[in-house]
């Protein structure tokens, strides 16, 4: 394993029984406080995003925004934000999904999101953790409603035991930096 990946793995803190009994939580916030490490992560993700010729970066709140905003700046691609229900004004589309820790959540996007993103069609979904893939599936639905196409998925971490990768669109490439 490359030294940078070892440092990245060491920076991520583990908390047992959080937020629920029996859950192992991976805290990625130390990565953000280390500029060199955060830049390493962004560089890995940006190279992938450029290689797949994405036209826009789509990310969910909250931690997805951290990666998405930095990557939009680094790649010079438009950023499309996906919000939790009742956080956006205007005409919206929505999709429901289930999370690892709770059932039934809703994500929303503006109906003009892709138009404002230079009429982007080829979208990469970026988030911090791939767990059950519920969030990603909801974003896939939203993009389809807007005639967008998911051309890639990009995550810092995959939680393999939750089998989220198997639920991603089968013909869409993905970049995952760490697998736990």
Swiss-Prot record:
It is an enzyme of class 2 (transferase). InterPro entries: Ade_phspho_trans, PRibTrfase_dom, PRTase-like, UPRTase/APRTase. It catalyses: AMP + diphosphate = 5-phospho-alpha-D-ribose 1-diphosphate + adenine. Its EC number is 2.4.2.7. Its main location: cytoplasm. One of its GO terms (cellular component) is cytoplasm. It is found in: Cytoplasm. Keywords: Cytoplasm, Glycosyltransferase, Purine salvage, Transferase. One of its GO terms (biological process) is adenine salvage. Gene3D superfamilies: 3.40.50.2020. Belongs to the purine/pyrimidine phosphoribosyltransferase family. This is Adenine phosphoribosyltransferase. The gene is apt.
């Amino acid at each position: 394993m490359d030294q940078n990946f070892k440092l990245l793995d060491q920076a991520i803190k583990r908390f047992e029984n959080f937020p629920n009994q029996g859950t192992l939580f991976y805290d990625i916030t130390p990565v953000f406080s280390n500029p060199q490490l955060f830049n390493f992560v962004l560089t890995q993700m940006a190279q992938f995003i450029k290689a797949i010729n994405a036209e826009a970066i789509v990310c969910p709140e909250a931690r997805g925004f951290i990666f998405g905003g930095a990557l939009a700046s680094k790649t010079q691609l438009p950023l499309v934000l996906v919000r939790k229900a009742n956080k956006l004004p205007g005409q919206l589309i929505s999709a429901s999904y289930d999370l690892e820790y709770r059932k039934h959540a809703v994500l929303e996007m503006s109906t003009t999101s892709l138009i404002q993103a230079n009429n982007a069609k080829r979208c990469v979904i970026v988030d911090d953790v791939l767990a059950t893939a519920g969030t990603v599936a909801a974003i896939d639905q939203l993009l389809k409603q807007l005639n967008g196409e998911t051309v890639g998925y990009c995550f810092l971490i995959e939680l393999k035991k939750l089998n989220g990768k198997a639920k991603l669109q089968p013909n869409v490439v993905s970049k995952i930096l760490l697998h736990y």
